[in-house]
Amino acid sequence: MSINKILSSTYKITQRSNNNNILFNGLKINSFSLCNTKTNLFTNKTNINLYNNYSKSSKSGKKSKKDEDDEDGEIETSKTSKKSASSSSMENVLKELEKSFGKGTLMKLGSQFSTQKVEVIPSGSMGLDIALGVGGLPKGRVTEIFGPESSGKTTLALHVIAQAQKAGGNCTFIDAEHALNPQWAARLGVNLDELFVSQPDNGEQALEIVDSLLRSKTMSVIVVDSVAALVPRVEIEGEMGDSHLGVQARLMSQALRKLSPTLKDSNCVLIFINQIRMKIGVMFGNPEVTSGGNALKFFSSIRIDIRKVGTVKKGDDIIASQVKAKVVKNKLAPPFKEAIFDIDFQSGINKTGEIIDLAVAEGIIDKMGSWYSYNDIKLDQGREKTKYLLEKTQPNLLVEIENKLRDKLIKSKPLINQQQEEEGNDQTSDEFDIENDDEIIEEDIDDETIKK
């Protein structure tokens, strides 16, 4: 389109008598207006060109974005294909491993272990079970009990044996010290007729016996008393005064490396009782150290430091020792928890007294003055009379109170009570099924009569 047509169609040209008007194709046009018109025309043309360029660039931008989406889809497809290829190759690797080493060689942690509950055997002390965090000593793990002399190490181990026997398990006591007192074990509730005892000649023999028992998968608890008494064969066959540096530590390290895999499969509680020694020349820090090297410290899932902290008197006579058990290592719950309990010279750990004290502290048992009551049931006056009542007259009530404490404090119950409750739940569920069946039969009969 020419400028003449644009001007004639767009603007009304007025003739003016001044000198600014010029003649353009027979028309007088103001020169200033013409310049502005030309400028506007060029500006509009530039804007049109810019708009065309922008539209082209936007189209190309849309096209590039579409290309990017296609590229992202291709990347995701390639990732999916790579993932499927890696998963198929992983399945092939798993099949090869299972074919070479057996099923379960390589497993996913979440699918196999996250839902499994830790099986435990109660320690005989309610406070210690709470301090352990899982309700007792774990199965398939190594537990070390150490402390000074006459602090209750063997007594605690015998209580664990008594609890395991109540659940129907087999137990073995490796008496390397040759100092087991059967009468004291019987007072603690150990069934001597069902307890296996071994008194080995040397440390190698004792650990070989432990290995054989673990491989048999027939034991619930094995106690080795003690690590300090596991004398290596070379030391027994040598002369008095011969130096055998590190022989016992090497023996324990080798034995624990061998016992650990079989211990997990046996589902047994392996307890090592250990003594303490004093380091020479220690100026700062704790000079105490356990015998047998450091291997037992690393392989143990639970380490309990038990020490005598006081005595319990009745008149002028000392009737019990007060001990403090500290969980210095715990792989299953927070460590460094403590428990203080009494070891009676006649009956061992005073578990019923612990339950009464804890139940009063948690509000399960009400105490008004010197009288104790549970669920509006008046028990007795005084702690000792209440203890006697629960032990001799109301043992079922004692178990009920203990279970409430476990549910509230450690969310775990002893293996004995779990089995009893499972049997009771099976019976009650059967009864409910029978009642439901009767209701279904009655409904069927009603429907048939209605049809008739």
Swiss-Prot record:
It comes from Dictyostelium discoideum. InterPro entries: AAA+_ATPase, DNA_recomb/repair_RecA, DNA_recomb/repair_RecA_CS, P-loop_NTPase, RecA-like_C, RecA-like_N, RecA_ATP-bd, RecA_C_sf. Residues 420-452 have a biased composition (Acidic residues). The gene is recA. The keyword Zinc-finger does not apply. Residues 53-90, 412-452 are annotated as: Disordered. Pfam families: RecA, RecA_C. One of its GO terms (molecular function) is ATP hydrolysis activity. The lineage of its organism: Eukaryota, Amoebozoa, Evosea, Eumycetozoa, Dictyostelia. It is found in: Mitochondrion. This is Mitochondrial DNA repair protein recA homolog. GO terms for cellular component: mitochondrion. Belongs to the RecA family. Involved in DNA recombination ability. Important for survival following exposure to DNA damaging agents. ATP binds at residues 147-154. It comes from the Eukaryota. One of its GO terms (biological process) is DNA repair. The keyword 4Fe-4S does not apply. Disulfide bonds: none annotated. PROSITE patterns: RECA_1, RECA_2, RECA_3. Keywords: ATP-binding, DNA damage, DNA recombination, DNA-binding, Mitochondrion, Nucleotide-binding.
